[in-house]
Amino acid sequence: MEAWKSGLTRRDWLGGAAATAGVLVIPGQASARRIAASDRVNVAVIGAGGMGANNMAKLTSQNIVALADVDLAHVAEAFVDSKGAPKPEMQPLKTAYDRAAKFSDYRRMFDSRKDIDAVVIATPDHHHAVAAKAAMERGIHVYVQKPLTYTVREGRTLLELARRNPKLVTQMGNQGHSGDDGRRVVELIRGGAIGRVREVHAWTNRPLWPQGEARPAAVAKPASLDWDVWLGPAAVDWGYHPDYAHFNWRGWVPFGIGSLGDMGAHLVDFPVWALEPGSPTRVETRHSRWGGDDNIWDGRPPADLGSYPLANITTYQFGNAKGGPLTMTWYDGGLMPPTPPAMPTTARMNPDGGVLYMGDRGMLMHDTYGQKPVLIGDGVEARAAAVPVSLPRIQDGRDGHEMNWIRAIRGEEAISSPFSVAVPLNETMLLGMVSMRADQPIEYDGASGRITNVAEANRFLDREYRKGWAL
């Protein structure tokens, strides 16, 4: 992908990131850790439950030297069944867990452990950038779960850090980017199997967590939970409630990015990769009511933002797309695009999630993570058969995303989803949330990183940080 936006090469865009990251001054940083191909990598994990445990399970061949989690008792519950008996399949992970140094605060971990080569960051969204920046400034390679950052400014800040230290190996946790099916989708779209694509639809069944709800009253927190560290950079403290932690934080404005942030990296990834549309030039969102709001449809966000709307439709216009103007529409909360008249009855849009590309010579549809691509239209199969394999395949596909990062750290292969790829993708997703919070369509200049038609909406490209947790 040589030209990420019209008139600008990717190098131009990367080089300009510092100028568009606000007034942030990035201090000097340590050189990236060098690891021999024969060595095991010293890995730390921040957020060792949930996705962090899944990531760690893929990395037990390495040295898991440190873990940081705000509720280590909760993490330990994953190793036993409902009766307290050990789960045999979890024992390799438990062995790694038992050997690792443990912290509740990753800032203390970074200060005290000088042997960390690489870190997995699998915290709630509002911690991602703060933890990643702290690691990168120490020369530590980073694997950051999706969505990469909570704000546009954070993404551009991390990209500038990566640009200044090109030996740092960075990876976003959108594992579908390493999958064989998704890579074939990109080849087919670029190879013209369905002709020129000017319309894309992407959808998900999320949320699977509280969203569109009023903020609950605080309750007593579990004794094992360090609530102050869980809040971290969040500028508000509503008090603990299980609707926030664990897992359920995704739908609450101070902590997560909603359904678009949670699943966009597994769906929007492929059209952005294949079509190289650059920055969206216009974004408009229609949605159900905000949590705590009484309006049913397109109600203005309440002053005290609680949870995101349960469902939304976000339309992106890419006026500078490489192949000509492109429209991409996102649906969540169970909403789906209308079935095209040309869609055969044998082709079914998966209600769990998928992407539909509408070309002038046919259509292509796939599930989440780029899986199970289906070609639709006369002559499409024949044209697809003629499209050569051009992208490298990752060992073990999407199940090998973590080890691709390790092998890249060792210098054995190219990284799959580095920040140079992940930041522009993440920015596209975030602009949908900005339009939602601005409560009106926004027009965006990707080169400057500014909203041009609604000046006050630019505040949503950044955020406030709690004292002691600033980026």
Q: Which functions belong to the PLM regions below?
A:
Residues 2-140, 156-169:
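N-terminal glycine-/serine-/threonine-rich beta1-alpha1-beta2 phosphate-ribose binding loop
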Residues 14, 56, 76-79, 107-110, ...:
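Non-transmembrane alpha-helical segments in soluble domains
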Residues 15-36, 307, 407-471:
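C-terminal helix-rich "cap/oligomerization" subdomain common to oxidoreductases
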Residues 45, 121, 144, 151, ...:
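Hydrophobic residues in well-ordered beta-strands that form the structural core
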Residues 54-59, 77-80, 130-134, 153-155, ...:
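Short, solvent-exposed loop/turn and secondary-structure capping segments
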Residues 103, 122-127, 148-150, 155, ...:
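Short, solvent-exposed turn/loop segments enriched in Gly/Ser/Thr/Pro and often Arg
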Residues 141, 149-224, 229:
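A contiguous active-site-proximal alpha/beta segment in oxidoreductase catalytic domains
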Residues 223-403, 407, 413, 427-433, ...:
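Glycine-rich, aromatic-lined ligand/substrate-binding cores of catalytic
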